[in-house]
């Protein structure tokens, strides 16, 4: 039965690498390398598609995801190479048994339930010597098996980070895609929708009528109304058309053909660059979450309630901003000419900082994704009915809340933010950078031609002054782009300022 040299049979424990067939080692390495190359080519191909379609923001978001995956890869390498040294560290027993994830005898039969990997993970990786034994009264800081489980957790983080990022972007784009019908309608009926000779009473407009009612007179009932409105129908047609009109009137030239829905879509892509990143502050949150996930403390159950509460609070605030603009229109005017004009200003947002809302959304999406990842990792490593899931009904509720928050934040809150944040005092320059250069080049080209032609006057300089209603920089690229005249003969080639894909 005994094998020669370092060999062993199935009853003698696992074989080392020197006794493993070469074909087995070559096959395993080849499969792993092939899978890695395919994944790298897929990411590279996605980047090429974004570049060809001029999706600069999505390409930058993809690069950020690759950077986050690289960080997770470094963490994995450090765990692999340093696991024997880490496992050799010892601490006093009174510290080694304090603040554990599970109780000492917490299991279905009154005994501690070992994870399914314990029986086959007693092995050495990248080192020949076993971890040093601790002296009496001391225990290892962390075992080799526990380090392997942390390694698996890092892998789960990487996979679910990519999945959640893709889901977030797909849901957000799907929501904004539904506004395309409204945009096409207002472009086709541009003259009728913006007829300056049409006078109406303020309370007769759809926008004011849908937001101003007896409930709006009391601030408590006002916010209750906004709370439920975000879940029933977050953006109405009148909301979209009114905010579109306010944005164009303040930031662009009147009567200009402008695809506002496409601008919102690019603005969402620009916001996506922020929400896919993992900042040091978020890594600190991960450490705190793991630190306080102590048996019997139930701190994580309280932390789980943070994403849904913040999501509902942000949605209520964004709806309140829309309703406040409707109230301001009613207070300012009894009769309006054309479409109602909202007052564009940063003061509508918390601390006059629209970007603060985006950072909160970033935290919500990350924490929610982390908790879902944590659930699936525990299920994989310890089973669905492990000591981690002592109150199973509570765990099911937490998972259901996580799925609901993911949908609510990605499909409703994030697109609503992308729309309402355009009512701030500034507009995003990153969306207009390429268009600005093209517009200026065309203007200079036309100016040069007309100056060289006898009897032709030079075209007027672009109006760099913004229209009243917002405090924006007078010479911002958006204003320069908006004020450049587009010749009628050029309109067939460039329908609007955002004519790209």
From Swiss-Prot:
Q: What's the protein's topology in the membrane? A: Multi-pass membrane protein
The lineage's top-level taxon is Eukaryota
The record ties this protein, via InterPro entries, to: Mlo
Renumbered to this chain, the Polar residues biased-composition regions fall at 491-501
Topological domain (Extracellular) residues are: 1-22, 90-151, 295, 381-391
Region entry Disordered, spans: 443-501
Q: Name one GO molecular function term.
A: calmodulin binding
Keyword Membrane carried by entry: yes
Query: Which UniProt keyword terms apply here?
Result: Calmodulin-binding, Membrane, Pathogenesis-related protein, Plant defense, Transmembrane, Transmembrane helix
Q: Which GO terms describe its cellular component?
A: plasma membrane
Give the transmembrane ranges. 23-43, 69-89, 152-172, 274-294, 296-316, 360-380, 392-412
* Compartment(s) where it occurs, according to its Swiss-Prot or TrEMBL record: Membrane
Where does it primarily localize? membrane
One matching Pfam family: Mlo
Any one Gene Ontology BP term: defense response
User: Which residues are on the Cytoplasmic side of the membrane?
Assistant: 44-68, 173-273, 317-359, 413-501
Calmodulin-binding: region residues: 450-471
Homology family: Belongs to the MLO family.
Q: What is known of its domains?
A: The C-terminus contains a calmodulin-binding domain, which binds calmodulin in a calcium-dependent fashion.
The record describes the protein's role as: May be involved in modulation of pathogen defense and leaf cell death. Activity seems to be regulated by Ca(2+)-dependent calmodulin binding and seems not to require heterotrimeric G proteins.
Protein's name in the database: MLO-like protein 5
Organism whose genome encodes this protein = Arabidopsis thaliana
């Amino acid at each position: 039965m005994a094998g020669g040299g370092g060999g062993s049979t199935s009853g003698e424990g696992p074989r080392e690498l020197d006794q493993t067939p070469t074909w087995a080692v070559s096959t395993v390495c080849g499969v792993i390398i092939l899978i890695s190359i395919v994944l790298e080519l897929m990411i590279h191909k996605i980047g090429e598609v974004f570049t060809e379609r001029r999706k600069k923001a999505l390409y930058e978001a993809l690069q950020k995801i690759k950077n986050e995956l690289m960080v997770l890869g470094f963490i994995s390498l450090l765990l692999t190479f340093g696991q024997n040294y880490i496992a050799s560290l010892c601490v006093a027993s009174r510290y080694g048994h304090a603040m554990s994830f599970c109780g000492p005898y917490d299991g279905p039969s009154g005994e501690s339930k070992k994870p399914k990997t314990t029986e086959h993970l007693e092995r050495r990786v990248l080192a020949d010597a076993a971890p040093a034994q601790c002296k009496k009264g001391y225990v290892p800081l962390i075992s080799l098996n526990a380090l392997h489980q942390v390694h698996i957790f890092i892998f789960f983080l990487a996979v679910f980070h990519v999945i959640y990022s893709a889901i977030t972007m797909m849901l957000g784009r799907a929501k904004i895609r539904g506004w395309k019908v409204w945009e096409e309608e207002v472009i086709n009926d541009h003259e009728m929708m913006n007829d300056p000779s049409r006078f109406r009473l303020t309370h007769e407009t759809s926008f004011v009528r849908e937001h101003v009612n007896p409930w709006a007179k009391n601030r408590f009932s006002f916010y209750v109304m906004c709370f439920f409105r975000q879940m029933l129908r977050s953006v109405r047609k009148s909301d979209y058309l009114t905010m579109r009109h306010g944005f164009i009137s303040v930031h662009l030239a009147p009567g200009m053909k402008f695809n506002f829905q496409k601008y919102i879509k690019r603005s969402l892509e620009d916001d996506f660059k922020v929400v896919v990143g993992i900042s040091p502050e978020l890594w600190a949150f991960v450490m705190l979450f793991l630190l306080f996930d102590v048996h019997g403390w139930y701190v994580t159950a309280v932390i789980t309630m943070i994403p849904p509460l913040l999501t509902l609070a942000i949605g209520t605030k964004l709806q309140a901003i829309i309703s406040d603009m409707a109230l301001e229109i009613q207070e300012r005017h009894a009769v309006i000419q054309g479409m109602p004009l909202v007052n564009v200003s940063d003061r509508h947002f918390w601390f006059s900082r629209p970007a603060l809302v985006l950072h909160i959304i970033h935290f919500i999406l990350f924490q929610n994704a982390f908790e879902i990842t944590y659930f699936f990792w525990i299920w994989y490593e310890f089973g669905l009915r492990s000591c981690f899931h002592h109150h199973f009904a509570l765990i099911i509720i937490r998972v259901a809340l996580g799925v609901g928050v993911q949908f609510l934040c990605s499909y409703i809150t994030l697109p609503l933010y992308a729309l309402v944040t355009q009512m701030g005092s500034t507009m995003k320059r990153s969306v207009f950078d390429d268009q600005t250069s093209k517009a200026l080049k065309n203007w200079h080209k036309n100016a040069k031609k007309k100056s060289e032609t006898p009897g032709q006057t030079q075209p007027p300089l672009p109006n760099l002054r913004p229209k009243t209603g917002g405090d924006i920089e007078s010479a911002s690229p958006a204003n320069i782009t908006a004020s450049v005249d587009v010749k009628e003969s050029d309109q067939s080639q460039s329908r609007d300022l955002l004519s790209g894909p």
